[in-house]
Amino acid sequence: DSAPVLEPTVFLVTLHSMSSPDEIFHIADDAAFTRTALEVFHRQAAACVPYREYLTRIGVEPEQVRSPEEIPFLPIELFKTHDIYCGETPPEAVFTSSATTGMTPSRHPMQSLALYEQAFRAAFRTFYGAPEHWSLYALLPNYLRRKGSSLVYMADRLIADCGSGGFYLDDYEALLEAMARDGKPKILLGVSYALWDLAERYAPKLRGTVVMETGGMKGYREEIPKEEFHKI
C-alpha cells in the first residue's frame, strides 16, 4: 500500500496564527473550517509583515476576502528570503527545507515544538490509529545528513511513540532484515529516490507494510510523474 506523507510544518504556520491554537484540532464541519480559516487569514494579514506586503502588492484587501477559496497563498520563494513568522515570542526552533545543491533553503520558524508534536501526532492517529500498533521505519538519507529537518524531528518522535522501527541511512539490507523479523504492521517512510533504489536493487516483498513517500528525487534521479513512480 502507499500513503501520502504527513506535512505538519505548513499546518503549523496556521496553528501559530490562531488566538487559541487548540481550536483547530476540534473542527467538526465545513462552517467551523471556514470560520477558522478566515480567522487565521485575517490575523496573518495583520501580524505577518511579509504576508501583508505581499497582499498589498497583488492588490488584495483582507476585508474583501470572505471564503477560504479567496485566500491568497504566499509563494514558497518568500520562505527563502523572509522570516514568515507572527509569533509574539521568539521561535523555539527554525526548521529548514532540504534544498537541492546550490539552492537557498526555505526557513520555517516554529513558535512551539509542543504544538508541532501535537499536530503530527493528531494527524497520525487520524490516518493510522494508535502508534503503538505500528512499527515505523525511516529511510531518509539526505535528511539525516543535514540539520534542521522537520521530517526527521517528526519521524524520531513517532518512532518513539511506536516503540519499534528506526532510522536507516543507506543500509538497505539491515532495513529489510529488521522489517522481515518484525511481526507488527509496518510503515516505511522514505524519500522517493531511496525507495526507488530499494525497489530496483532488492525488489522487496513488503507484506503488511504501508509505504509513505516523501521528498522527491533531490537531484539524485530524474523526476518522473507520480503515477509512473508508484508503479515501480
Predicted regions and their residues:
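Residue-level preference for long, well-ordered alpha-helices that form the structural scaffold
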Residues: 29, 33, 109-116
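Active-site glycine/GP-rich loop and adjacent strand/helix microenvironment
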Residues: 13-15, 19-24, 28-51, 133-135, ...
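Active-site diphosphate/adenylate-binding microenvironment
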Residues: 46-96, 102-109, 116-117, 121-132
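N-terminal amphipathic/basic-hydrophobic helices that include classical n-h-c signal peptides
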Residues: 1-17
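Short, charged/polar micro-motifs that form catalytic or ligand-binding hotspots
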Residues: 41, 106, 110, 141
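Internal, well-ordered alpha/beta segment that forms a basic, Gly-enriched binding/recognition surface
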Residues: 101, 116, 120-159
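Poly-acidic low-complexity segments
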Residues: 61, 75, 112, 169-172, ...
